[in-house]
């Protein structure tokens, strides 16, 4: 709708604005030059699976067996897809926070299952056990825990995660933990809920956000063998295997690029502080994000527009694009998502335009 606009400032981007690290790109080039261009094992090369397990062991204290408890996928999106297609069936329920990234609900519905959203707007966007418990029924099959969250940037503390894990320990309910932003946490070290409840947790991760590799399409699914041996069958008949060239680049990213995310994270923290101060000075109510690179901003009551109309008027009048909150379920209505995955100069120009626009309503 807005891509054709000249002089557009886009705060809609859901990917890092940094290039893939040079050493990672070179590993991909070397894979081509060395003719590493054939199918790999369905679950991915064993060297990459070992590197992935070693990475999450050192970073998050997780213990997975490379031969049987990790699958290399075509991005985190495929990992989510094959997990749901394995564990869901007609009439089962999946509990999700609202607002939430829109990529889960269609897959749940395609399986004939029922998405059950929990409104977390009045809980500082925190998807805690207290919020979850009232929605659990005998049909509940899975709880989706995306943290840090897209679109809110809010994460969960070690204590909050342990409460959820302890409650679910004796229940026949899976946890799908989407931890794709785990390397982009700002104020606290990321804790995986699998460290408390490995046997019922399917961990989704990947390199799109941590190493700015969105187009390489490399994700990881970690789970106990009794779960992965079923998911692997779906993956096998879905895509055969992940891209062989990208797998070589991914191995380089996880080994030689073990801490590559730190450079990006330092810059994101600076941007977060700048954007937070600018938005609050304009009178917006915002929850400061714990990670990722998004603000989920409440539209002031003085502006009598729904989120879509607000975003449309904003882009038409100022050439600043944001994502309407309604894109993130009905519980995103009344908000908009602003991505700070862009330069400080771009942020300053765009926020100056936004401030001028907001003043018209006061």
Regions found by a protein language model. Give the residues of each.
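PLP-dependent class I/II
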Residues: 1-9, 15-30, 63-362
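Conserved N-terminal alpha-helix of the aminotransferase class I/II PLP-enzyme fold
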Residues: 39-73
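Glycine-centered small-residue hotspots that permit tight backbone geometry or close packing
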Residues: 14, 34-35, 44, 153
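Phosphate/diphosphate ligand-binding glycine-rich loop within oxidoreductases
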Residues: 19, 29, 33, 38-42
């Amino acid at each position: 709708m807005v891509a054709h606009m000249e002089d557009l400032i886009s705060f809609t981007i859901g990917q890092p604005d940094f290039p893939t690290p040079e050493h990672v790109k070179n590993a991909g080039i070397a894979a081509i030059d060395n003719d590493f261009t054939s199918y790999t094992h369905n679950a991915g090369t064993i060297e990459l699976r070992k590197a992935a397990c070693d990475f999450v062991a050192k970073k998050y204290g997780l213990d997975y067996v490379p031969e049987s408890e990790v699958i290399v996928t075509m991005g985190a999106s495929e990992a989510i897809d094959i997990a749901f297609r394995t564990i869901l069936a007609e009439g089962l329920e999946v509990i999700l926070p609202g607002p939430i990234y829109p990529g889960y609900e269609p897959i749940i519905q395609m399986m004939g299952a029922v998405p059950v959203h929990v409104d977390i707007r009045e809980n500082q966007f925190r998807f805690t056990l207290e919020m979850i418990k009232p929605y659990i029924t005998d049909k509940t099959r899975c709880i989706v825990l995306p943290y840090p969250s897209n679109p809110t940037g809010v994460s969960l503390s070690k204590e909050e995660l342990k409460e959820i894990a302890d409650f679910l320990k004796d229940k026949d309910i899976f946890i799908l933990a989407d931890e794709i932003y785990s390397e982009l946490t700002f104020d606290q070290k990321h804790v995986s809920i699998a460290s408390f409840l490995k046997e019922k947790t399917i961990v989704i991760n990947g390199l799109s956000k941590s190493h700015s590799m969105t187009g390489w399409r490399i994700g990881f699914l970690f789970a106990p063998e009794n779960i992965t041996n079923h998911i692997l069958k779906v993956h096998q008949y879905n895509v055969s295997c992940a891209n062989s060239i990208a797998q070589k680049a991914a191995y380089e990213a996880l080994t030689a690029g073990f801490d590559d995310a730190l450079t990006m994270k330092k810059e994101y923290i600076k941007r977060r502080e700048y954007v937070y101060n600018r938005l609050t000075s304009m009178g917006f109510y915002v929850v400061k994000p714990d990670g990722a690179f998004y603000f989920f901003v409440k539209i002031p009551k003085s502006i009598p527009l729904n989120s879509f109309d607000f975003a449309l008027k904003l882009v038409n009048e100022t050439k600043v694009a944001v994502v309407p909150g309604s894109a993130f379920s009905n519980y995103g209505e009344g908000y908009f998502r602003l991505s700070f995955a862009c330069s400080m100069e771009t942020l300053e120009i765009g926020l100056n335009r936004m401030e001028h626009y907001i003043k018209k309503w006061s």
